[in-house]
């Protein structure tokens, strides 16, 4: 969910924005 977290869904948005 972070900027470069690379979560399961490949989302680049989150607390690391």
From Swiss-Prot:
One GO molecular-function entry: neuropeptide hormone activity
InterPro entries according to UniProt: Pyrokinin_CS
Tissues expressing this chain: Expressed in abdominal perisympathetic organs and abdominal ganglia.
GO cellular component: extracellular region
Subcellular location(s) of the protein: Secreted
Family: Belongs to the pyrokinin family.
Primary role: Myoactive.
Name this protein carries in UniProt: Pyrokinin-5
Source organism of this protein record: Laxta sp. (strain Australia) (Cockroach)
């Amino acid at each position: 969910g972070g900027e470069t977290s690379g979560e399961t869904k490949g989302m680049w948005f989150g607390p690391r924005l």
